[in-house]
Swiss-Prot record:
It catalyses: alpha-D-glucosamine 6-phosphate + H2O = beta-D-fructose 6-phosphate + NH4(+). Its EC number is 3.5.99.6. One of its GO terms (biological process) is N-acetylneuraminate catabolic process. This is Glucosamine-6-phosphate deaminase. It comes from Vibrio atlanticus (strain LGP32) (Vibrio splendidus (strain Mel32)). The gene is nagB.
Length: 266
């Protein structure tokens, strides 16, 4: 596991965007051999999406031969609802880049049969072989995608009941009213995520400090699903200084020295 300890959340977005652009450009994707990118929603990746849009407009990267898969979607709210994850992705990213519509893959939270929809999504991912890079965020309780505490670490795309903590955290997007936050969601599984060639998780803010501690210094534990990153051969966590508050000083120092060349220009 790599840990990229930076000072500010804006630097996390800048570093993550540069890493994605390098991976895409080094891959040299074509229509027949696209780069497959997994994407999250939420507040944390917004700085990364903004930086990616700027790099695209500067001619540094094209998304024409990039295929995307999103992590999750609420069940039961209209696709055009302002807080659906479909709306989030188009508003904050897809509408500003040259990605082809047919290359965008999103879970359908209004499917007639949710189990069939989850299988369709898994099969679509498998049709590309694997996801080359999956970017994610993490919840205060260590959940990744909507894999809440006690989720199976070998789970696949499925329906999940959202915890009260998650619904309270997400109520800020629903006028502060938890009753407006859906109780269920479709989400990729931890096993689905671990199948990716590379996983990059963004962690910002002091409220994520316990989750970061569990991911880096704790044992692999289904109560902190982000800890499953320890099982992956190519995982990277990009964090800001407030998120490191629960880590040992020597842990932060170790990774700061290890990644010095990769963070010196930020």
């Amino acid at each position: 596991m790599r840990l990229i300890p930076l000072n500010q959340a804006a630097q996390v977005g800048k570093w993550a965007a540069a890493h994605i652009v390098k991976r895409i450009n080094d891959f040299k994707p074509t229509a027949e051999r696209p780069f497959v990118l997994g994407l999250p929603t939420g507040g944390t990746p917004l700085a990364t999406y903004k930086a990616l849009i700027e790099l695209h407009k500067a001619g540094e990267v094209s998304f024409k031969n990039v295929v995307t898969f999103n992590m999750d979607e609420y069940i039961g709210i209209p696709a055009d609802h302002p807080e659906s994850y479909r709306t989030f992705m188009y508003t904050n990213f897809f509408n500003h880049i040259d990605i082809q519509e047919e290359n965008i893959n999103l879970l359908d939270g209004n499917a007639e049969n949710n189990e069939v929809e989850c299988k369709r999504y898994e099969d679509k991912i498998k049709s590309y072989g694997k996801i080359n890079l999956f970017m994610g965020g993490v919840g205060n309780d260590g959940h990744i995608a909507f894999n809440e505490p006690a989720s199976s670490l070998s789970s696949r795309t499925r329906i999940k009941t959202l915890t009260e903590d998650t619904r309270i955290a997400n109520s800020r997007f629903f006028d502060g009213d938890i009753n407006q936050v859906p109780k269920y969601a479709l989400t990729i599984g931890v096993g689905t995520l671990l199948d990716s060639e590379e996983i990059m998780v963004l962690v910002t803010g002091h409220n994520k400090a316990l989750a970061l501690e569990a991911a880096v210094e704790g044992s692999v534990n289904h109560l902190w699903t982000v800890s499953a990153l320890q099982l992956h051969p190519k995982s990277v966590i990009v964090c800001d200084e407030p998120a490191t508050q629960e880590l040992k000083v020597k842990t932060v120092k170790y990774f700061s020295e290890l990644e010095a060349e990769n963070i010196k220009d930020l």
